[in-house]
Amino acid sequence: MIKNFYKKKNNLYIMLVILVVIFVVILGYIYMNRHVKFKDSNMAYEISRTIGPNVNPENVKYKDVYAIKELNIGFPGKYDTLEDIKLCKNLRILTINGGGDKWKPLKKEEDIDFLLYEQAQKYQKELSDIVPSLKRIEIFSFSNYLENCNISNFDFLAKCCNMKVIKIYDST
């Protein structure tokens, strides 16, 4: 009789563990299939474009954003905030303002956008919070083409334990 009691108790524990595991899996599935709410509409467009050609910001899901390995955001001045980069948890390569190796000579300097000093300081602060939080980042590339994006302090890169390559271009 006591054996039966312990056997039933063990079976109950096993069933409870199985139910908890199933519940956690279902919650994870629901979370990953939720639609992302971006803080910046231009960054939402850039991230959705990175995911695929037929993806628009309204139908981006967390599982799509987590799958991004490489992100090139271009000129940071077109964004109100860079916070949405944090959503790309598996990001390995981040390129900001192109890469110096990607620039083609421009005919006119008017073709280039420039950041104000205050904007550059704001983005530098945001990057110092965002980049170290990207645990898998291996390559960081930044370009200050014709001093259009004067971010000068990259000390935050020292906090990135998986960083293998840092490319900082300055054309001056």
Write out the residue ranges for each language-model feature.
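N-terminal Sec-pathway targeting helices
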Residues: 4-20
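Aromatic (phenylalanine/tyrosine) cluster motif
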Residues: 5-6, 23, 114-117
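Residue-level recognition of alpha-helix termini/interfacial anchor residues
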Residues: 9, 33, 130-133
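Short amphipathic alpha-helical segments that mediate assembly, nucleic-acid/protein binding
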Residues: 12, 43-44, 127
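Membrane-interface motif at the C-terminal end of an N-terminal transmembrane signal
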Residues: 24-35
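LRR flanking "cap" motifs
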Residues: 36-87
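Concave beta-strand-loop units of leucine-rich repeat
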Residues: 66-131, 136-172
